[in-house]
Amino acid sequence: MAFRRVLTTVILFCYLLISSQSIEFKNSQKPHKIQGPIKTIVVVVMENRSFDHILGWLKSTRPEIDGLTGKESNPLNVSDPNSKKIFVSDDAVFVDMDPGHSFQAIREQIFGSNDTSGDPKMNGFAQQSESMEPGMAKNVMSGFKPEVLPVYTELANEFGVFDRWFASVPTSTQPNRFYVHSATSHGCSSNVKKDLVKGFPQKTIFDSLDENGLSFGIYYQNIPATFFFKSLRRLKHLVKFHSYALKFKLDAKLGKLPNYSVVEQRYFDIDLFPANDDHPSHDVAAGQRFVKEVYETLRSSPQWKEMALLITYDEHGGFYDHVPTPVKGVPNPDGIIGPDPFYFGFDRLGVRVPTFLISPWIEKGTVIHEPEGPTPHSQFEHSSIPATVKKLFNLKSHFLTKRDAWAGTFEKYFRIRDSPRQDCPEKLPEVKLSLRPWGAKEDSKLSEFQVELIQLASQLVGDHLLNSYPDIGKNMTVSEGNKYAEDAVQKFLEAGMAALEAGADENTIVTMRPSLTTRTSPSEGTNKYIGSY
């Protein structure tokens, strides 16, 4: 079964490679001149960990980092002045549970209650987690010793780390991932099925790059979460989606990585290919190996001297962080208010998350604190990525929203040196042991994020039209979800490529019905898959 899956993937790769070469030739544009030293930026967004949980204990050897001292604590009952306190610890190894990270859970973690009118005291983590499961508070208040995460420790010492980078929204995964590439979640403060089906309509940094004649690419493993953006489903962009296993190392070796490259993880945890996104209860050691592989691939690329790698986390995943979340001066990106019952105004940020800036243009041991603007209240958050890309690549397009116009940018850190460093490590430390004491639990139920990915996959192949759609994914195991997602992406890309070869309008989107999801050749009438919506 595994061999057949690999063989099918290889065949699809060859088909996409041949098709994309001819299609990209037809769509070639006049090159856009980039003025600065960085010509390629690679973005990796990991899952659900706070800064203090991952990097807080680096402060013991790096006092300039705003991390943990060991004196930080949370009461088990915020309203009781005599409540028992849970202190931070450095004994995090493996977390089997999934701490709360919904909008309402995070509100309690930040403010200690449902009242958001006061200062963010960051004192409700233990209370909120203990209400979910007795004993969870200790895990939520724990952090990793630096030696347990050797890849991150080396990157922090060799390059740059932000200690004031926040999630864009105080809520779960998907809204924050939207901000990474579009500086808004289009009013999404949780996940609404009908929006996931239609695709989110906002303009993205991918669109801005395309307008300016610059390239972008998404290297995915199970399923690209970037398909949640409606515009990326258009036929002309399907050639920008590449198998990580088959194309990432090859493109890097040949010096052909796009100007803006997004590397996505494996979101489903199976024995043969364990998840490497760091989402609890996935093994953080697998995430370390993944980051090591990405870095070493880029380090050996001929593009390295003109490249930057940014690694961040979508949100904190319910884990403790002591730095108060910014709640003042944060602009609503587009005037959209969130749905009931919270009617969130998108006017405060989420919890601080680990973020690295890696490049031969970054000095060793750089620690980046607050930004210098563009406003007195500006912060580093996920919207800083499209904001910086606009400046780094001197894009003529406007800012995407009020949020990226406000967010701090980090282009100045590439201009401190006159030339790139020659001493960047070629290899990062080996990660020999797994932190999880057991293998993948393929028969487990899907997490909330995984169910959302299944709903995305169902849209790609038309299963969202079935009466069973509202329950799709709820009864799947991880193994079943992985197969469903991978098969859906393969079918969607094949249908799209066939449609392009048949002469379909490049701005349309493949729409498929459940009865039409089997593989079809162009001679079988691929135009029946095409729809503009």
UniProtKB/Swiss-Prot annotation:
Keyword Hydrolase among record annotations: yes
Pfam family for this entry, one: Phosphoesterase
BP terms from Gene Ontology: phosphate-containing compound metabolic process
Keyword Hydrolase applies: yes
Induction: Not induced by inorganic phosphate deprivation.
Top-level EC class as recorded in UniProt: hydrolase
UniProt keyword annotations, A-Z: Hydrolase, Secreted, Signal
Gene3D superfamilies listed in its UniProt record: Alkaline Phosphatase, subunit A
EC numbers, comma separated: 3.1.-.-
GO cellular component entries: extracellular region; Golgi cis cisterna
Tissue expression profile of the protein: Expressed in roots, leaves, stems, flowers and siliques.
Location within or outside the cell: Secreted
GO function term, MF aspect, one: phosphoric ester hydrolase activity
Family: Belongs to the bacterial phospholipase C family.
Protein name as it appears in the record: Non-specific phospholipase C1
